[in-house]
A protein has these predicted regions:
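Acyl-thioester-dependent acyl-group transfer interface
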Residues: 61-77
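Short, contiguous, pocket-lining structural segments
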Residues: 2-7, 26-30, 65-68, 92-95, ...
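Structured surface interface patches that mediate subunit assembly and partner/cofactor docking
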Residues: 3, 18-21, 44-59, 75, ...
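Short, charge-rich amphipathic segments
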Residues: 27-40, 56-57, 63-66, 136, ...
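An N-terminal domain-cap segment
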Residues: 1-50
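Short, structural beta-strand-to-alpha-helix junction motif
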Residues: 30-31, 72, 177
Length: 209
């Protein structure tokens, strides 16, 4: 079973355990909202454009609310837990390594601080790759270069319209495990990372997806 499949299974189990009204790290969303999001994203792909295109946000938001009105929480979770439809399966790794991990942590950490999980080197490599990919999108408008620095993997430099200074003193360095860095670049603050740099530069960092 792949990493994203294991995360799907664990997230579904946790969502059924905590119920539809549990908090998540997704601002304003309960687990019911998250279940509807996961369902729409894979099973109503023609309505999911608002997750990536701002002009379609109202359409997707409406579809999400309609799914909650028409389907029970358990149905939405179980439909998603059964796996992606056939036309999406070839894209499962590309689409869901970060998605399933991030939302699993959104529920795990939604009600308070949770210790990060430990992963194999192979999984860490996947998560670091996802952090790089998501970070390129999230930090594209940031003027300040951000260097993600995991303990056992090469550092990754993101953002920074002005580039990294020769002395490297006008950068923000974020240190943490790959999974924590992935959560941080996607806007989560309930993470265990160390952020180093000039305070003004840190305040300039703009994480936006």
């Amino acid at each position: 079973m792949s990493f994203q499949q294991k995360e799907r299974e664990k997230l579904a189990e946790l969502m059924l355990e905590v119920g539809p009204d549990a908090p998540t790290l997704c601002e304003g969303w309960t687990t019911y909202d998250l279940a509807a999001h996961l369902f729409i994203r894979e099973h109503r792909t023609h309505l999911a454009g608002g997750y990536v295109v701002s002009a379609l946000k109202d359409l997707t938001r409406s579809a999400q609310e309609k799914a909650k009105q028409q389907e029970s929480y358990e149905h939405l979770v179980n439909e998603w837990a059964a796996g992606p439809p056939l036309h999406i399966k070839p894209l499962d790794s590309f689409m869901n390594v970060s998605e399933n991990f991030i939302h699993h942590e959104d529920v795990r950490r939604g009600s308070g601080t949770v210790e990060p999980r430990e992963f194999s080197r192979a999984v860490e490599t996947k998560l670091m790759g996802a952090a790089k990919m998501m970070g390129k999108m999230a930090l594209t408008s940031s003027d300040v270069p951000v260097v993600l620095t995991p303990p056992n993997h090469p550092p990754v430099t993101l953002g920074g319209k002005r580039g990294v200074a020769e002395q490297g003193d006008r950068v923000v360095r974020v240190k943490g495990e790959p999974g924590e860095l992935l959560l941080w670049v996607t806007g989560r603050d309930a993470v265990q990372v160390e952020i180093e740099g000039n305070e003004a530069d840190i305040q300039e960092v703009n994480r936006q997806l």
